[in-house]
UniProtKB/Swiss-Prot annotation:
Protein name: Methylthioribulose-1-phosphate dehydratase
Protein's job: Catalyzes the dehydration of methylthioribulose-1-phosphate (MTRu-1-P) into 2,3-diketo-5-methylthiopentyl-1-phosphate (DK-MTP-1-P).
Residues the record marks as active site: 145
Recorded metabolic or biological pathway in which this protein acts: Amino-acid biosynthesis; L-methionine biosynthesis via salvage pathway; L-methionine from S-methyl-5-thio-alpha-D-ribose 1-phosphate: step 2/6
Organism: Paracoccidioides brasiliensis (strain Pb18)
Protein family: Belongs to the aldolase class II family. MtnB subfamily.
Length: 240
Protein backbone atom coordinates (compact mmCIF):
# COMPACT_ATOMS: atom_id res chain seq x y z
CA UNK A 1 0.00 0.00 0.00
CA UNK A 2 2.96 2.29 -0.52
CA UNK A 3 0.97 4.35 -3.02
CA UNK A 4 -1.39 5.54 -0.29
CA UNK A 5 -0.29 8.95 0.89
CA UNK A 6 -0.75 10.54 4.28
CA UNK A 7 -4.45 11.03 4.92
CA UNK A 8 -5.37 7.98 2.80
CA UNK A 9 -6.28 10.18 -0.19
CA UNK A 10 -9.77 10.78 1.19
CA UNK A 11 -10.21 13.62 -1.29
CA UNK A 12 -10.69 10.98 -4.00
CA UNK A 13 -14.09 10.04 -2.55
CA UNK A 14 -15.24 13.47 -1.39
CA UNK A 15 -17.50 15.27 -3.87
CA UNK A 16 -20.86 17.04 -3.98
CA UNK A 17 -21.36 15.80 -7.54
CA UNK A 18 -24.01 13.04 -7.53
CA UNK A 19 -22.37 11.65 -10.69
CA UNK A 20 -19.03 11.15 -8.93
CA UNK A 21 -18.20 7.40 -8.69
CA UNK A 22 -17.92 7.56 -4.90
CA UNK A 23 -21.52 8.80 -4.78
CA UNK A 24 -22.83 6.66 -7.63
CA UNK A 25 -21.67 3.33 -6.17
CA UNK A 26 -23.63 3.72 -2.90
CA UNK A 27 -26.67 4.90 -4.88
CA UNK A 28 -26.43 1.92 -7.23
CA UNK A 29 -26.05 -0.52 -4.35
CA UNK A 30 -29.13 0.90 -2.61
CA UNK A 31 -31.05 0.52 -5.85
CA UNK A 32 -29.87 -3.05 -6.34
CA UNK A 33 -30.70 -3.91 -2.73
CA UNK A 34 -34.29 -2.82 -3.35
CA UNK A 35 -34.43 -5.40 -6.19
CA UNK A 36 -33.03 -8.16 -3.97
CA UNK A 37 -29.84 -8.38 -6.02
CA UNK A 38 -27.27 -7.65 -3.29
CA UNK A 39 -28.76 -8.99 -0.07
CA UNK A 40 -26.60 -10.29 2.78
CA UNK A 41 -23.55 -8.22 1.70
CA UNK A 42 -23.40 -10.11 -1.63
CA UNK A 43 -22.69 -8.55 -5.01
CA UNK A 44 -20.89 -5.32 -5.78
CA UNK A 45 -20.13 -2.57 -8.27
CA UNK A 46 -17.12 -0.81 -9.71
CA UNK A 47 -16.68 2.30 -11.87
CA UNK A 48 -13.71 3.40 -13.96
CA UNK A 49 -13.11 7.11 -14.30
CA UNK A 50 -9.97 8.21 -16.15
CA UNK A 51 -7.05 6.45 -14.45
CA UNK A 52 -8.93 5.52 -11.28
CA UNK A 53 -11.05 2.48 -10.40
CA UNK A 54 -13.66 2.91 -7.65
CA UNK A 55 -14.87 -0.31 -5.97
CA UNK A 56 -17.45 -1.15 -3.31
CA UNK A 57 -15.93 -2.96 -0.30
CA UNK A 58 -16.40 -6.61 0.60
CA UNK A 59 -18.50 -7.86 3.48
CA UNK A 60 -20.48 -4.65 3.94
CA UNK A 61 -24.27 -4.34 3.82
CA UNK A 62 -24.64 -2.89 0.35
CA UNK A 63 -27.64 -0.70 1.20
CA UNK A 64 -25.57 1.04 3.90
CA UNK A 65 -22.42 1.82 1.87
CA UNK A 66 -21.17 5.39 2.11
CA UNK A 67 -18.62 7.23 -0.08
CA UNK A 68 -15.93 6.90 2.60
CA UNK A 69 -16.25 3.09 2.31
CA UNK A 70 -15.06 3.09 -1.31
CA UNK A 71 -11.70 1.66 -2.40
CA UNK A 72 -9.73 3.41 -5.16
CA UNK A 73 -7.19 1.77 -7.45
CA UNK A 74 -4.80 3.38 -9.87
CA UNK A 75 -5.44 2.10 -13.41
CA UNK A 76 -4.00 0.16 -15.11
CA UNK A 77 -3.13 -2.18 -12.27
CA UNK A 78 -2.19 -5.88 -12.12
CA UNK A 79 -4.97 -8.37 -11.45
CA UNK A 80 -2.56 -10.78 -9.75
CA UNK A 81 -1.11 -11.16 -7.23
CA UNK A 82 -3.49 -9.13 -5.03
CA UNK A 83 -0.50 -7.53 -3.30
CA UNK A 84 0.53 -5.95 -6.62
CA UNK A 85 -2.72 -4.03 -7.10
CA UNK A 86 -2.13 -0.30 -6.93
CA UNK A 87 -4.50 0.90 -4.22
CA UNK A 88 -4.35 4.65 -3.73
CA UNK A 89 -7.17 4.70 -1.20
CA UNK A 90 -8.11 1.93 1.22
CA UNK A 91 -10.78 2.41 3.90
CA UNK A 92 -9.62 1.42 7.35
CA UNK A 93 -11.04 -1.83 8.77
CA UNK A 94 -12.62 -2.84 5.44
CA UNK A 95 -11.56 -5.52 2.98
CA UNK A 96 -11.15 -5.05 -0.78
CA UNK A 97 -13.82 -6.70 -2.88
CA UNK A 98 -13.15 -10.30 -3.87
CA UNK A 99 -14.71 -9.29 -7.22
CA UNK A 100 -11.78 -6.96 -7.98
CA UNK A 101 -9.96 -9.11 -10.60
CA UNK A 102 -13.26 -9.83 -12.37
CA UNK A 103 -14.09 -6.13 -12.48
CA UNK A 104 -10.59 -5.48 -13.86
CA UNK A 105 -11.19 -8.07 -16.59
CA UNK A 106 -14.25 -6.07 -17.70
CA UNK A 107 -12.30 -2.81 -17.67
CA UNK A 108 -9.63 -4.41 -19.86
CA UNK A 109 -12.43 -4.88 -22.42
CA UNK A 110 -13.21 -1.17 -22.37
CA UNK A 111 -16.02 -1.14 -19.80
CA UNK A 112 -16.73 1.98 -17.78
CA UNK A 113 -18.75 0.18 -15.10
CA UNK A 114 -19.15 -3.42 -13.95
CA UNK A 115 -21.94 -4.76 -11.75
CA UNK A 116 -22.14 -8.09 -9.91
CA UNK A 117 -25.48 -9.28 -8.53
CA UNK A 118 -26.83 -12.38 -6.81
CA UNK A 119 -30.15 -12.13 -8.64
CA UNK A 120 -32.36 -15.15 -7.95
CA UNK A 121 -33.62 -15.06 -11.54
CA UNK A 122 -30.06 -15.22 -12.85
CA UNK A 123 -29.35 -18.21 -10.61
CA UNK A 124 -32.54 -19.97 -11.69
CA UNK A 125 -31.84 -19.66 -15.42
CA UNK A 126 -28.37 -21.15 -14.93
CA UNK A 127 -29.99 -24.19 -13.33
CA UNK A 128 -32.64 -24.48 -16.04
CA UNK A 129 -30.03 -24.25 -18.79
CA UNK A 130 -27.94 -26.94 -17.08
CA UNK A 131 -30.94 -29.26 -16.85
CA UNK A 132 -32.12 -28.68 -20.41
CA UNK A 133 -28.82 -28.24 -22.29
CA UNK A 134 -26.12 -29.63 -20.02
CA UNK A 135 -23.20 -27.83 -18.34
CA UNK A 136 -21.85 -26.40 -21.61
CA UNK A 137 -25.08 -24.66 -22.60
CA UNK A 138 -25.58 -20.90 -22.66
CA UNK A 139 -28.71 -18.88 -21.96
CA UNK A 140 -30.58 -18.00 -25.18
CA UNK A 141 -33.78 -16.05 -25.76
CA UNK A 142 -35.37 -14.36 -28.80
CA UNK A 143 -38.45 -12.46 -29.95
CA UNK A 144 -38.82 -10.51 -26.72
CA UNK A 145 -38.97 -6.69 -26.89
CA UNK A 146 -36.63 -6.15 -23.93
CA UNK A 147 -33.77 -7.73 -25.90
CA UNK A 148 -33.47 -4.31 -27.55
CA UNK A 149 -31.89 -3.08 -24.30
CA UNK A 150 -28.77 -5.20 -24.89
CA UNK A 151 -25.90 -4.23 -27.24
CA UNK A 152 -24.94 -6.46 -30.17
CA UNK A 153 -21.30 -5.79 -29.36
CA UNK A 154 -18.85 -2.94 -29.14
CA UNK A 155 -19.81 -0.35 -31.77
CA UNK A 156 -22.44 -2.66 -33.31
CA UNK A 157 -25.59 -0.99 -32.06
CA UNK A 158 -28.38 -2.61 -30.07
CA UNK A 159 -29.98 -6.01 -30.54
CA UNK A 160 -33.27 -6.28 -32.39
CA UNK A 161 -36.52 -8.06 -31.62
CA UNK A 162 -35.71 -10.98 -33.94
CA UNK A 163 -32.14 -11.43 -32.69
CA UNK A 164 -31.21 -14.26 -30.34
CA UNK A 165 -29.49 -13.06 -27.19
CA UNK A 166 -26.81 -15.43 -25.88
CA UNK A 167 -25.26 -15.15 -22.41
CA UNK A 168 -22.44 -17.57 -21.49
CA UNK A 169 -22.52 -19.46 -18.20
CA UNK A 170 -19.47 -20.42 -16.14
CA UNK A 171 -19.26 -22.76 -13.16
CA UNK A 172 -19.05 -21.34 -9.66
CA UNK A 173 -15.97 -21.72 -7.47
CA UNK A 174 -15.46 -21.73 -3.70
CA UNK A 175 -13.68 -18.36 -3.86
CA UNK A 176 -14.83 -15.40 -5.97
CA UNK A 177 -11.39 -14.51 -7.33
CA UNK A 178 -11.02 -18.03 -8.74
CA UNK A 179 -13.78 -17.21 -11.24
CA UNK A 180 -11.48 -14.83 -13.11
CA UNK A 181 -9.97 -17.30 -15.58
CA UNK A 182 -13.34 -18.80 -16.51
CA UNK A 183 -14.83 -15.32 -16.90
CA UNK A 184 -12.01 -14.27 -19.23
CA UNK A 185 -12.38 -17.48 -21.25
CA UNK A 186 -16.11 -16.80 -21.64
CA UNK A 187 -15.30 -13.26 -22.78
CA UNK A 188 -12.97 -14.68 -25.44
CA UNK A 189 -15.52 -17.26 -26.60
CA UNK A 190 -18.32 -14.67 -26.70
CA UNK A 191 -16.49 -11.46 -27.69
CA UNK A 192 -19.71 -9.47 -28.13
CA UNK A 193 -21.19 -10.31 -24.73
CA UNK A 194 -21.72 -7.71 -22.03
CA UNK A 195 -22.53 -10.28 -19.34
CA UNK A 196 -21.48 -13.64 -17.94
CA UNK A 197 -23.71 -15.79 -15.74
CA UNK A 198 -22.21 -17.80 -12.88
CA UNK A 199 -24.07 -21.01 -12.13
CA UNK A 200 -25.72 -21.15 -8.71
CA UNK A 201 -24.23 -17.72 -7.95
CA UNK A 202 -25.33 -14.72 -10.03
CA UNK A 203 -24.13 -12.56 -12.90
CA UNK A 204 -21.49 -10.05 -13.96
CA UNK A 205 -22.73 -7.27 -16.25
CA UNK A 206 -20.68 -4.42 -17.68
CA UNK A 207 -21.29 -1.42 -19.89
CA UNK A 208 -19.51 1.44 -21.59
CA UNK A 209 -20.65 3.73 -18.78
CA UNK A 210 -22.66 3.57 -15.56
CA UNK A 211 -26.05 4.19 -17.17
CA UNK A 212 -25.53 1.48 -19.78
CA UNK A 213 -24.30 -1.07 -17.26
CA UNK A 214 -27.30 -0.35 -15.02
CA UNK A 215 -29.93 -0.51 -17.76
CA UNK A 216 -28.38 -3.64 -19.28
CA UNK A 217 -28.44 -5.28 -15.85
CA UNK A 218 -32.11 -4.34 -15.48
CA UNK A 219 -32.97 -5.61 -18.97
CA UNK A 220 -31.22 -8.91 -18.37
CA UNK A 221 -32.93 -9.47 -15.04
CA UNK A 222 -36.30 -8.79 -16.70
CA UNK A 223 -35.45 -11.37 -19.36
CA UNK A 224 -34.31 -13.95 -16.79
CA UNK A 225 -37.50 -13.58 -14.78
CA UNK A 226 -39.57 -13.82 -17.94
CA UNK A 227 -37.61 -16.90 -19.03
CA UNK A 228 -38.30 -18.68 -15.73
CA UNK A 229 -42.03 -17.96 -16.08
CA UNK A 230 -42.00 -19.01 -19.75
CA UNK A 231 -40.36 -22.29 -18.79
CA UNK A 232 -42.98 -22.88 -16.09
CA UNK A 233 -45.69 -22.40 -18.73
CA UNK A 234 -43.96 -24.67 -21.23
CA UNK A 235 -43.09 -21.83 -23.61
CA UNK A 236 -39.80 -21.96 -25.56
CA UNK A 237 -37.19 -19.24 -25.00
CA UNK A 238 -36.15 -19.20 -28.65
CA UNK A 239 -38.92 -18.99 -31.22
CA UNK A 240 -38.45 -21.45 -34.06
Amino acid sequence: MSDIKDGNNDHLVESDDPEHPANLIPALCRNFYSHGWVTGTGGGASIKRDNHIFIAPSGVQKELIQPHNIFVLSYPTPKYPPSARQYIRKPLKLNPSACTPLFLAAFERGAGCCIHTHSQWAVLVTLLVEREKGPEGCFEISNIEQIKGIPRGKGKGMMGFYDTLKIPIIENTAFEEDLTQSLEEAMEMYPDTYAVLVRRHGIYVWGDDVAKAKTQCESLDYLFQLAVEMHRLGLPWVKS
